[in-house]
Amino acid sequence: MNTGGGQYTDFPAVETHGGQFISYDIFGSLFEITSKYRPPIIPIGRGAYGIVCSVLDTETNELVAMKKIANAFDNHMDAKRTLREIKLLRHLDHENIIAIRDVVPPPLRRQFSDVYISTELMDTDLHQIIRSNQSLSEEHCQYFLYQLLRGLKYIHSANIIHRDLKPSNLLLNANCDLKICDFGLARPTSENDFMTEYVVTRWYRAPELLLNSSDYTAAIDVWSVGCIFMELMNRKPLFPGKDHVHQMRLLTELLGTPTESDLGFTHNEDAKRYIRQLPNFPRQPLAKLFSHVNPMAIDLVDRMLTFDPNRRITVEQALNHQYLAKLHDPNDEPICQKPFSFEFEQQPLDEEQIKEMIYQEAIALNPTYG
């Protein structure tokens, strides 16, 4: 999240519901939150879902990022995604994962249509940094990689696959602390039906996902980490595919056309046929192409960008790699004590049920509003 977005301007504020809520007019968009939140209120981001502002939580005296998801229940998939994200963030507790602070209850239960979620406030994200002209030392890049793997170790230990790791989902603050966000696409590690509801950003997508393999594993996140780290070192995306086919082409041109033994992981005959008709590219030596990158870093990336997910390095193994030796501390890389349960998604949920479940999350965090 980038705070470059706004400076505090006086937004009209009106107390509502007997002073329990305050309604702000942010550039014509209504922002109605509980009265513990006070100015300065600063718009810091805009997305397809709505608007994000930083605002002061007077109970903790902390500035938080407040995201408004307007008409959150209009689209069934989006509503499920919001519920999933809230439940996941409430379950996860780790220094390298964005912490949820609040789900604001609606003033009137029967008129519940917008969802407000507050999280820790961060200064920027990795996408902004990569695109900026801010210089990054190798130590910076190494430290970002270490924190990303440290957070991912915890996520995978909770039986969760993130599925959408990319630079804009890695938030940073001025101390170079990195926190993983955006769990709306996360999935259980042991689930076989392929979720097509959202398009994961193509550039960071593992080959098994490009090939529509339905039994993908946590290894897809490791592939994304390899792509992100190389983008950090080169200041440009490693595989900026224009479409599915182009993406696969870029992968094979750099990493070589997969051999028969690389394809053992997929039972999809169409995928195998597609690979077999590709031109036969040899694997390019990454160390030669990226001679400015530490050879030990290249060795680690090589192990992350391995075609066969069964042979790809795991997060735990990556943390143990020599390149991260001076940061790695096995006593300070915690795992999640309790696996996350995706059970709430097993039964088909209608709009009202999702609304009720999000309402219950809000009330759990704000018992006096129940």
Curated annotation (Swiss-Prot):
How is this protein annotated for GO cellular component?
cell cortex; nucleus
What the entry lists under SUPFAM superfamilies is as follows: Protein kinase-like (PK-like) (SSF56112)
The places in or outside the cell where this protein is found are: Cytoplasm; Nucleus; Cytoplasm, Cell cortex
What is the main EC category here? transferase
Keywords, in A-Z order:
ATP-binding, Cytoplasm, Hypersensitive response, Kinase, Nucleotide-binding, Nucleus, Phosphoprotein, Plant defense, Serine/threonine-protein kinase, Stress response, Transferase
Q: Which residues carry this modification: Phosphotyrosine?
A: 198
Modified how: Dually phosphorylated on Thr-196 and Tyr-198, which activates the enzyme. Dephosphorylated by DSPTP1B/MKP2.
Listed under subunit, the entry gives:
Interacts with DSPTP1B/MKP2, NDPK2 and VIP1. The interaction with DSPTP1B/MKP2 is repressed by fungal elicitation. Binds to LIP5. Interacts with VQ4. Interacts with RACK1A, RACK1B and RACK1C. Interacts with FLZ9. Interacts with MKK5.
Q: What is this protein called?
A: Mitogen-activated protein kinase 3
Organism, scientific name: Arabidopsis thaliana
